[in-house]
Amino acid sequence: MSNDHPQPLDAAEIPRFAGIPTFMRLPAFTDPAALQVGLIGVPWDGGTTNRAGARHGPREVRNLSSLMRKVHHVSRIAPYDLVRVGDLGDAPVNPIDLLDSLRRIEGFYRQVHAAGTLPLSVGGDHLVTLPIFRALGRERPLGMVHFDAHSDTNDRYFGDNPYTHGTPFRRAIEEGLLDPLRTVQIGIRGSVYSPDDDAFARECGIRVIHMEEFVELGVEATLAEARRVVGAGPTYVSFDVDVLDPAFAPGTGTPEIGGMTSLQAQQLVRGLRGLDLVGADVVEVSPPFDVGGATALVGATMMFELLCLLAESAARSA
């Protein structure tokens, strides 16, 4: 163990329900340059078109992340021994101004990126990923592994509104931040607005693995396809909790039945080990619609799964 690496509070010494909540019970930091991986909340759901409440996601995920321990039980990755990890607090948001929130979030992540820190974020609705991409993808477009029930490549909602949680990846592709040929979406399902709903994703070259295809392929073949698509370049992972069946993640804005199990999601994320990861997020945890903290626990657990991968990625580039 490196003695100068921040460590979580020990639950054998300080009970999980005690102390000030931070992600993974790690120390809080204000300077991203002090860290190699920064844990960040984005408490904003101004792009939500159905059930609001994801603005409360970061706080509840912080609470439930107290259940995470120090070492991954399968991979044996000990992220806090590999790199310096800490809680960078929440990105600034404006709850009554969508465009100002996008600017504020982008500015925050530009500082994180300039410091060379890999961000691991908790939303917030899925629109928060767009300003993160604006900060991380300016130098070169990123590849992406995207877990979701929805493609989030729609164009406009409610007239001519280009910014909702259903549009972030269309905007990111249009702005040259996301490479569609290095993008794979896993778990897509549910009814659609029109037969052409997936036309943009299909025509620009995104590899879409609908839930039905995932069931046929299984975890290993799906992972092989995902790794083929993103290749060796810089890659971002975006995990929307509604990729899970509502039985496992009821507290979300736009639930869809017929989703994957929490174990399948864990296996898929673990299978991304070794990719050139530059950041990740967990979004759409909506505590007002949660049951017994189940979805917040999903968010915290998937955050730890992603942290283990990002820690290895940061250690390789150190």
From Swiss-Prot:
Mn(2+) 1 binds at residues 126, 148, 152. It comes from the Bacteria. It is an enzyme of class 3 (hydrolase). GO terms for biological process: putrescine biosynthetic process from arginine, via agmatine. Gene3D superfamilies: Ureohydrolase domain. Mn(2+) 2 binds at residues 150, 240, 242. It catalyses: 3-guanidinopropanoate + H2O = urea + beta-alanine. Binds 2 manganese ions per subunit. Keywords: Hydrolase, Manganese, Metal-binding. Its EC number is 3.5.3.17. The keyword Cell membrane does not apply. Pfam families: Arginase (PF00491). Its cofactor is Mn(2+). GO terms for molecular function: agmatinase activity; guanidinopropionase activity; metal ion binding. Catalyzes the hydrolysis of 3-guanidinopropanoate to beta-alanine and urea. Possesses low activity against 4-guanidinobutanoate. Has no activity against arginine and agmatine. Homohexamer. Belongs to the arginase family. Agmatinase subfamily. This is Guanidinopropionase. It comes from Pseudomonas aeruginosa (strain ATCC 15692 / DSM 22644 / CIP 104116 / JCM 14847 / LMG 12228 / 1C / PRS 101 / PAO1).
